[in-house]
Regions:
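Beta1/beta-strand and adjacent pyrophosphate-binding region of the FAD-binding site
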Residues: 1-14
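Glycine-rich FAD pyrophosphate-binding loop
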Residues: 9, 20-43
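Redox-cofactor binding/interface segments in oxidoreductases and associated redox assembly factors
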Residues: 9, 144-145, 265
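Residue-level detector of alpha-helix initiation sites
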Residues: 12-13, 37-38, 282
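A conserved beta-strand/loop capping segment in the N-terminal third of enzymes
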Residues: 52, 56-103, 124
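Predominantly flavin-linked oxidoreductase catalytic cores and closely associated redox partners
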Residues: 105-235
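FAD/FMN-dependent oxidoreductases across multiple families
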Residues: 213-294
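C-terminal helical "tail/cap" subdomain of flavin- and related membrane-associated enzymes
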Residues: 293-376
């Protein structure tokens, strides 16, 4: 089995960003995507300013793809509402459109893209993967970018977590003019929902909720949430959406501290930030770009150093996002948060800035490679 120079498992933003940067650096990158074509994803409709900057550096113009500009955050808890200006311009874009643009860009700059191929297992010692048809492929380096999905042989170690993972749900609602330029965050017990306009004018609804609240099923959960969040219920016209996409076992706050030689864990395989912070896509793009640049400058042996640096870099933003998520999970914390933001709205912008993980790559001085632009 002859290895390829760089093997990337996962065709989402992290994997595609890594493939683009590797191809630009002259590294023959092979990107494996389990989806044969365009598809939706539960998370990732919000593009913060740092994600937009990273996309521009990758050669993707989100606004040209139809992304809807967002300049304000509308935070709702029960009947209470606070509206705040974001510190910089953001946008809303479906993952279907974003992922296709990134994969197309990776192919255009020279990466080999294999679509519709499901990877069943990995061998970290050999930096190899096995497809569901038994075929195997090895890489000089293996970039793990499978998002929230585990890969046998390289599954994330979640055994030391004190908190059970959360569940994510996504549905599409009819758009309305009052969502223009705004992302709405609806807070309720042990969860929250985000609502924004997509490029086609529909509204993307994403919910994060403690997994135990799903014990009675989605219909029962949504009935409870609509009672707790009447303004969200009004957005849904009092009716449950006909279709939900779901993912279970989302370990918010998790970060990997170490990796095997030649294995780069990027995106949610390296660090999982609460979606309340809106930084998931930026972290995916930034980690993919940074890891690719580190590999191009330092080879497979730089993986362990890079992973440790990314762990340190993401510690404070993810810690702050976790504090906000946990604080908003209960009625006392939500009430305090809403009062603080009403009295001192500047705190919202400051919190948004503190939960960002810069797209600028780690280890840039040691590898000598060019850094990706991003906010300081």
């Amino acid at each position: 089995m002859r290895p390829v120079p760089a093997l990337i498992v996962g065709g989402g933003p992290a994997g595609a960003a890594a493939a683009i940067m590797l191809a630009r650096a002259g590294v023959a990158a092979h990107l494996i995507d389990r989806h044969a074509g365009p598809h939706e994803s539960v998370c990732g409709g919000f593009l913060g300013w740092d994600a937009l900057a990273a996309l521009r550096d990758l050669g993707v113009d989100a606004l040209a793809l139809g992304a809807r500009p967002i300049g304000r955050l509308r935070l709702l808890s029960g009947e209470r509402c606070v509206e705040l200006a974001l510190p910089h311009a953001a946008a809303g874009l479906s993952r279907r459109v974003l992922d296709e643009a990134l994969i197309g860009r990776a192919r255009a700059v020279g990466a080999t893209v294999l679509r519709g191929r499901a990877v069943r297992a990995a061998d970290p010692a050999g930096r190899s993967i096995r497809f569901d048809d038994g075929e195997e492929l090895a890489g000089g380096a293996l970039f793990l970018a499978t998002g929230k999905h585990e890969l046998r042989g390289l599954a994330r170690d979640l055994g030391q977590r004190r908190e059970a993972p959360c569940a994510g749900l996504r549905a599409v609602l009819p758009g309305c003019p009052t969502l223009a330029g705004v992302i709405e965050m609806h807070l309720f017990d042990r969860g929250y929902a985000g609502l924004l306009l997509q490029e086609d004018g529909s509204a993307n609804l994403c919910l994060s909720v403690a997994r135990e609240r799903l014990a009675g099923g989605v219909a029962a959960l949504m009935a409870e949430i609509m009672a707790e969040a009447p303004r969200l219920a009004a957005r849904m016209d009092g009716k449950m959406p006909a279709h939900f996409e779901a993912i279970a076992g989302v370990p918010y706050g998790w970060r990997v501290a170490a990796t095997a030689p030649g294995i780069f864990r990027i995106g949610d395989q390296g660090a999982v930030i609460a979606s309340l912070a809106g930084d998931g896509i930026a972290i995916a793009l930034g980690s993919g770009m940074s890891a690719a640049q580190t590999f191009a400058g330092g080879g497979p042996e730089a993986a362990e150093r890079w992973q440790a640096q990314w762990h340190r870099r993401s510690r404070r933003p993810i810690g702050i996002a976790e504090a906000l998520r946990r604080g908003a999970a209960g009625p006392v914390g939500r009430a305090l948060l809403m009062r603080l933001l009403r009295w001192m709205p500047g705190l919202g912008a400051q919190a948004a800035l503190l939960t960002r993980v810069s797209a600028r790559r780690t280890g840039e001085r040691r590898s000598g490679a060019r850094s990706a632009p991003g906010p300081d």
